[in-house]
Amino acid sequence: MWTAWCVAALSVAAVCGIRQDTTTVLRVTKDVLGNAISGTIQKSDAFRSALREVPVGVGGVPYNDFHVREPPPKYTNGRQLGGNYKYGHIKANDNRAQLGGKYRYGEILDSDGSLRDLRHEDYRPPDSAYHRGSGRYRSAADSSSVGRLYRRELRPGEIPAGVATGALGPGGLLGTGGMLANEGILAGQGGLLGGGGLLGDGGLLGGGGVLGVLGEGGILSTVQGITGLRIVELTLPRVSVRLLPGVGVYLSLYTRVAINGRSLIGFLDIAVEVNITAKVRLTMDRTGYPRLVIERCDTLLGGIKVKLLRGLLPNLVDNLVNRVLANVLPDLLCPIVDVVLGLVNDQLGLVDSLVPLGILGSVQYTFSSLPLVTGEFLELDLNTLVGEAGGDLIDYPLGRPAILPRPQMPELPPMGDNTNSQLAISANFLSSVLTMLQKQGAMDIDITDGMFEDLPPLTTSTLGALIPKVFQQYPESRPLTIRIQVPNPPTVTLQKDKALVKVFATSEVVVSQPNDVETTICLIDVDTDLLASFSVEGDKLMIDAKLDKTSLNLRTSNVGNFDVFILEMLVEKIFDLAFMPAMNAILGSGVPLPKILNIDFSNADIDVLEDLLVLST
């Protein structure tokens, strides 16, 4: 599918072109991706941005774990250290009992159901007792019960009837409404130990009370007990990556966080180890760029150390701190990981940058498909766009019938045990680079007498010594110009441990007349085989070529037919000493390599394989 594109070149020209098939493949291990993420973190201020106030709540509502456990009970007003009731209030029943008891001071329950006031010596049956404080006796129930009409005087040491049973019965010491019963002096609601009492739930020292400040439901057991949390130090994380075949990567960042804060009982110094884990999917956006996208992010806390009151009572707030940090750190650190991955995505996007190829053209890499993720490596397929400064794309192979299929990218060799990255460049791509140079005329050269000291004199006398008819036509020595042109694109053939460049050139021998008129003596076709070697300097692939052999064919001659073989040594020397240095000079600008994930190929091992050049680091 042809997709039009147009980008501005760094030179004055613009480069417009079309997408090609995959010509370059990059494989990287998890270590390369991990190093890229680590380098991004070190160079950016993403983690330093976390050194700030920790947002404990939003709109006054603290982070909590109420979705796990039930919310704390609601009290009447909650003003008195978490107590159930207002200041000075206790819970009573239908009378003004003391400390929550059901009956008045000094009253006991007799066996016949009547209430006896031990503060007085006279007794009255329940049916004649005045109700609610008007007499010494009153009924223990709403309806009158059958009672005694007469009660005798007690002998010395005698226990009144009903006292023993009343101690354990309703209203007794331990019975219902008694001192220790559910509604009595100690255990009843509002009693000493009961709910809302001194030690009861919501009481002065109970849950939510003074001691409840440090307990479940108290002030310190909620986030309100810790305020002013601020991250003061965040170490650069240790990054580890695990490849998830067909998905992406599993990212783990281990860091240490130092946090300061305040509590009701002193300042807090918190040190916590955090392991941030994220499942990251590798996708492609609509523009065709790969993107690392977080699917899930979690934080695992460990090694929490809390210094409170110079070491006092640290265990009381450990669970609270753990719960608070478990709630707030994911919302604080996971977005930072997302920012870091965004910067890594930007690095992936740098591949698409237009890079000058000398002053004559440019190279641009683009992604051709969704990267492949295996258990061993991440594979990126790249297109290469080689453009001329004049605006045309080099669509290799030029001059070939359109029905011929393009050469497919060969299979890459397995990665070695000590290999972290592998860049494979096809012969097709190298041919495109040389084709761009050929179309710009960079390989054409005019060689004149005296230009190269190692060459013999380029005159009619030198040529006439080999071709007598030249001497006959030009008895006086005249200077010659050897005009070498490359009319067709060179081709690159890669074989095992051998890179061959075939260049077809024409060599026109021109003589200069006294009146500056040039006359062609002959035109020779020269087929040359060049041996190429490769190296890496910086971020560029350097190509150096040397002449292997030449083959000549006489196309035209103005001095009659002659055996072109007699010129083979001279032509080969001209190509070796003049043409090859000129060609290596234009190749000296190097071929830009893809800039991706901070990979350094400067010390790469280079292997020439069948139709493939492989750089391994």
From Swiss-Prot:
Keyword set, alphabetical order: Cytoplasm, Disulfide bond, Glycoprotein, Secreted, Signal
Gene3D superfamilies given in the database record: Bactericidal permeability-increasing protein, domain 1, Bactericidal permeability-increasing protein, domain 2
Main localization category = secreted
Q: Where in the cell is it found?
A: Secreted; Cytoplasm
Quick one: where's region Disordered? 117-142
Q: Sites of glycosylation?
A: N275
GO MF terms on file?
lipid binding
In this UniProt entry, which cysteines form S-S bonds? C297-C334
GO CC, sorted alphabetically, is: cytoplasm; extracellular region
Source taxon at top rank = Eukaryota
Signal peptide: which range, if any? 1-17
Which Pfam family, giving just one, matches this sequence?
Answer: LBP_BPI_CETP
| UniProt KW Mitochondrion keyword | no
PANTHER family with a match to the protein in the record: BPI FOLD-CONTAINING FAMILY B MEMBER 4, BPI FOLD-CONTAINING FAMILY B MEMBER 4-RELATED
Entry's family note? Belongs to the BPI/LBP/Plunc superfamily. BPI/LBP family.
Function as written in the Swiss-Prot or TrEMBL entry: May have the capacity to recognize and bind specific classes of odorants. May act as a carrier molecule, transporting odorants across the mucus layer to access receptor sites. May serve as a primary defense mechanism by recognizing and removing potentially harmful odorants or pathogenic microorganisms from the mucosa or clearing excess odorant from mucus to enable new odorant stimuli to be received.
The name this protein goes by in its record: BPI fold-containing family B member 4
Q: Which organism is it from?
A: Mus musculus
Lineage of source species: Eukaryota, Metazoa, Chordata, Craniata, Vertebrata
